[in-house]
């Protein structure tokens, strides 16, 4: 909790230096293991503590409902009838337990304000011991099948192109291999209390896994891929769409960092498969070209040269392999640390097996591309 407070203090110190509005912080910690009915009074108490104009309101004026149940965080919608009887809604995001092993919260909080200022995601309204409060976005969360709709795919590509142009202060060094190796060091030392999980865990060859990481790092380095501020978690659940306004929102930047452009796009294409990892749903070359054209030239996608599109296509195909390694190793840690009911170890094998299946095809594609460009 002290670390969380220090992060918010650092963020507010930067605001103070720029005469910007301070973001309120509460030392409250909400027990995420509680069932929702028992959690609601604590959430109301938290909101009253954070936002002083709500402090004297009766609890009956608050309503709390779950709006998302991902495999990392818990999102709650809190609606309040203020003195004017006008209803105001905010989103309370509760971090999953032990997520500090896979998420750099300092990096997230210091970036989120710049992204919000650039028009991305929800506005940051406050922070607390194990989460944050943001403005509520009136839109629906996308499903994996939505992302392949040509119109929505083009919207996502345009939005991502703008996102990658945002300048976030600090080191511009790509974090992909730093994060993967950090995950690897943690994952390789774990033990499980459940015999079945431990037995399955022991079938993982960490020596082989480490060799794959180093080989892929060296191989993708041959591409000299551009480095951008990347979202790094472009699954369907991190896009929201207001159908009436046809407005798309990119949300949740907790994995965001400077990274290789191809990783962000390749990771997004992998997410067409959903949590079930049905990779028959991976976008076709035609669908990828459609996306890449709108990413590179949102106003004139048909004027992008085939050479430009092919270059990004190959870069994306290479880094989709890194996406498989990243989330495969992440899943091992989550299998040990997360209280959420999800077959994380099974997910590791689904991602790692797909990595091994795609590796020879991708290596051949990239090698041919590099040879042709000499």
Curated annotation (Swiss-Prot):
Say yes or no: keyword Metal-binding present: no
| E.C. numbers | 2.7.1.82
Q: In which pathway does it act?
A: Phospholipid metabolism; phosphatidylethanolamine biosynthesis; phosphatidylethanolamine from ethanolamine: step 1/3
Q: Name one Pfam family in it.
A: Choline_kinase
Any Gene Ontology CC annotation? plasma membrane
Which Gene Ontology molecular function entries are recorded, alphabetically? Answer: ATP binding; ethanolamine kinase activity
Q: What does the record give as the reaction this protein catalyses? A: ethanolamine + ATP = phosphoethanolamine + ADP + H(+)
Keywords assigned? ATP-binding, Kinase, Lipid biosynthesis, Lipid metabolism, Nucleotide-binding, Phospholipid biosynthesis, Phospholipid metabolism, Transferase
Q: Does the keyword Cell membrane apply?
A: no
The residues the record assigns to binding ATP are 93, 252
Biological processes, Gene Ontology terms:
phosphatidylethanolamine biosynthetic process; phospholipid biosynthetic process
Q: Which family does it belong to?
A: Belongs to the choline/ethanolamine kinase family.
This chain's function reads:
Involved in phospholipid biosynthesis. Catalyzes the first step in phosphatidylethanolamine biosynthesis.
- Protein name, UniProt field: Probable ethanolamine kinase
Write down the species.
Arabidopsis thaliana (Mouse-ear cress)
């Amino acid at each position: 909790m002290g670390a969380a407070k220090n992060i918010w203090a650092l963020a507010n110190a930067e605001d103070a230096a720029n005469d910007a509005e301070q973001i309120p912080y509460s030392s409250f910690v909400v027990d995420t293991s509680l069932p929702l009915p028992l959690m609601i009074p604590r959430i109301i108490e938290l909101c009253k503590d954070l936002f002083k104009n709500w402090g004297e309101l009766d609890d009956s004026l608050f309503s709390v409902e779950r709006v998302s149940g991902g495999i990392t965080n818990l999102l709650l919608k809190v609606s309040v009838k203020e003195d004017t009887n006008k209803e105001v809604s905010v989103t309370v995001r509760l971090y999953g337990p032990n997520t500090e092993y896979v998420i750099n919260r300092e990096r997230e909080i210091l970036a989120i304000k710049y992204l919000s200022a650039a028009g991305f995601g929800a506005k940051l309204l406050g922070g607390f011991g194990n989460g944050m409060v943001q403005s509520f976005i009136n839109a629906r969360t996308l499903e994996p099948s939505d992302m392949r709709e040509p119109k929505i795919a083009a919207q996502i590509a345009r939005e991502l192109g703008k996102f990658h142009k945002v300048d976030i202060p600090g080191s511009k060094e790509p974090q992909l291999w730093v994060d993967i190796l950090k995950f690897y060091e943690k994952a390789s030392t774990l033990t499980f209390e459940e015999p079945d999980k431990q037995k399955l865990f022991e079938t993982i060859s960490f020596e082989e896994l480490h060799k794959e990481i180093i080989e892929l790092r060296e191989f993708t380095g041959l591409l000299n891929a551009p480095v951008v501020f990347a979202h790094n978690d472009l699954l369907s659940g991190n896009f929201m769409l207001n159908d009436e306004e046809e407005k798309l929102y990119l949300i949740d930047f907790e994995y965001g960092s400077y990274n290789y452009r191809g990783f962000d796009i390749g990771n997004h294409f992998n997410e067409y498969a959903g949590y079930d990892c049905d990779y028959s749903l991976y976008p076709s070359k035609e669908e990828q070209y459609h996306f890449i054209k709108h990413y590179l030239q949102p106003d004139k996608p048909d004027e992008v040269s085939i050479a430009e599109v092919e270059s990004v296509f190959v870069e994306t195909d290479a880094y989709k392999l890194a996406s498989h390694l990243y989330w495969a190793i992440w899943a091992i840690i989550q299998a040990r640390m997360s209280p959420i009911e999800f077959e994380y170890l099974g997910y590791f094998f689904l991602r790692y097996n797909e990595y091994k299946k795609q590796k020879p095809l991708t290596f051949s594609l990239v090698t041919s591309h590099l040879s042709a460009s000499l």
